[in-house]
């Protein structure tokens, strides 16, 4: 069995995005010696995957993002992948990683580390102008960093969001003016 649930573990309507939960005899029973982590993902026999998705009218499941890749800014949910997808459409941007930046007023804001093609450069105002008609205003990054070389990658050559975020917040990658 599969269902899509909201943050209160209530099933959502068809087409609405929520966390994917699975119930099966093949589900794991626990994380070994990790009761707290087990209790977070196994709720009433349902395993919460950490993936966000929806079930369409034909019953097909579409995964849209990871729960951990969601920025919550003042109660609004922002998908890192959605913002990255829009940034990829800019002709000067080679790659980008979007992540949450702590903020006292909103809880989190949108931050991004960018690697430009051919050492091109843009000001953050120019990038914001590009994004204005593509994203809701609250989804547009407020913090920018510029990678001198390619963005950090993990062992499988995937972009490393966690490492990039740490480098940016620790000021090891320069801020884009």
Where are these regions (language model features)?
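Conserved beta-loop-beta connector loops within the AMP-binding
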Residues: 1-21, 57-58, 120-124, 160
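AMP-binding/adenylate-forming catalytic core of the ANL superfamily
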Residues: 8, 24, 29-30, 52-139, ...
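Flexible lysine-rich "adenylation lid" loop at the C-terminal edge of ANL adenylation domains
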Residues: 9, 148-168
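Conserved ATP/PPi-binding loop(s) of AMP-dependent carboxylate-activating enzymes
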Residues: 10-41, 76-78
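A short acidic/small-residue loop/turn micro-motif
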Residues: 19, 69, 166-168
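Regulatory helix in c-di-GMP signaling enzymes, encompassing the GGDEF I-site helix
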Residues: 131, 144, 157
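Acidic/polar alpha-helix N-cap and adjacent early helical turns
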Residues: 165-177
